[in-house]
Amino acid sequence: MKITILSGGTGTPKLIQGFKEILPNEDISVIVNTGEDTYIGDIYLSPDIDTVLYTFSNLINDETWYGLKGDTFFCHEQLKNFGFDEVLRIGDKDRALKMHKTSLLKKGVPMSEIVDIERKSLSINSKIYPMSDEKIESKVLIEENNEKILLKFHDFWVSRRGNAKVLDIFYENSNYAKAADGVLKAIEESDFVIIGPSNPITSIGPILSISEIKDALKEKLVFAVSPIVGENPVSGPAGTLMHAKGYPVNAVGVYEYYKDIVDVLVLDNSDINKKKEMNCEVLYANTIMKTIDDKITLARNILDYYKSR
């Protein structure tokens, strides 16, 4: 059995940890958001890609879901001494991966090739794909002092810590972007696809904004795991961003956002009263993944539901 997972950098990696314990890793493919990619100084950051790489290689700092567990920050601190204060702390070992990407990108190597080199270097048997080899940027339109300002998502969430009135979200350059090499084949060869519990607007939305990916998903059985429990996102700014796009911050809003492609919506047990408002199948489970057992159980629940259909 082969599956493909759509992932951002938080939420979904927990589910990936569950699936990689119950399926042969070579049968798992992951398509990852790159809409938050940016430069800090001369270093190229692809945060969601790196988080997925570290998740599969059991290196992820699972307290922050960013960077490597046990990393040191000598370079970051030394740069501060020279007057260069990085807005994001980059660990020393993590910096090596980012320098590798930066070097190859400057040589014109496509991101999909770079990620494939890195996954092999980290002894990862699963396939990991950026959503596109083309540059797509998630932009957040905010209002500040009666002025409209368009920010990169990284600037909105990291530099400003999400403290702004959000008016809208855009995916710059997505209208003409193509899926990265291998993405459409991974979807086609999968028995089913899982949209993980990442932020729908800025983690999954950029992937779906690529028309050929969305069209391919319409031909497959698609599960979507809600990142909202009750009226609260499990983590991150999903609530603020869903509200800005006109969706209610609850399970119904998640359904409305995914309704063109979702066949089975996976909701937390506490949202059992929401099914009547959705025109799709609903699987209830514990979607709050605090332990490895929680992660494995949710993955197994999805797998068992698929087998029982």
UniProtKB/Swiss-Prot annotation:
GO biological process, alphabetically ordered: F420-0 metabolic process
Pfam (any one): CofD
Family indicated by similarity: Belongs to the CofD family.
EC number of the protein: 2.7.8.28
Subunit organization: Homodimer.
HAMAP family cross-referenced by the UniProt entry: CofD
Protein name: 2-phospho-L-lactate transferase
UniProt pathway: Cofactor biosynthesis; coenzyme F420 biosynthesis
Top-level division of the source organism's lineage: Archaea
Cofactors, names only: Mg(2+)
InterPro entries: CofD, CofD-like_dom_sf, FbiA/CofD
GO MF: LPPG:FO 2-phospho-L-lactate transferase activity; magnesium ion binding
Reactions the enzyme catalyzes: (2S)-lactyl-2-diphospho-5'-guanosine + 7,8-didemethyl-8-hydroxy-5-deazariboflavin = oxidized coenzyme F420-0 + GMP + H(+)
UniProt function note: Catalyzes the transfer of the 2-phospholactate moiety from (2S)-lactyl-2-diphospho-5'-guanosine to 7,8-didemethyl-8-hydroxy-5-deazariboflavin (FO) with the formation of oxidized coenzyme F420-0 and GMP.
Residue sites binding 7,8-didemethyl-8-hydroxy-5-deazariboflavin per the record: D50, R89
NCBIfam families to which the protein is assigned, alphabetical: F420_cofD
